Amino acid sequence: MATIEGDIYAFKRKCEALGVKPAVRLNVLSDINYINIIRKFPTVQFYDYTKNIKWAYKQLPSNYHLTFSYSGKVGYKNLIEKVIQETSHNVAVVFRKELPDTFMGRRVIDGDVNDFRFDDDENVIVGLKAKGKAKKDFTSGFVVN
């Protein structure tokens, strides 16, 4: 953890020198709880995607933005649909074809334009177009037709 904190501190200083706000995505291929580190850097914007539904009902630091990941997988689908109905958290959904205007009653925005999820309006679906192997994924529930 000390290395991560050192890297964030160095990045923060570089961003300050450049006059830009630092933004860090710690969980790219994981879903690790970094809340203690995030709290140490209140002037840094942190953001992640997650499938951990418990985070939807927790009080998060104001500098931490989560976008939940949709899946139609049995057992998870009902939970993520509940998040969509009960909270204003954004949910990322991968679509096989063109992005629809709405999904599950929410406006769909084009999430492929950039990865700055913390700049998105609340209560939206972050639409992503299927790429690579996902285009041929017809069984996992990850891609919506």
Q: What is the predicted role of each segment?
A:
Residues 1-145:
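Class I S-adenosyl-L-methionine
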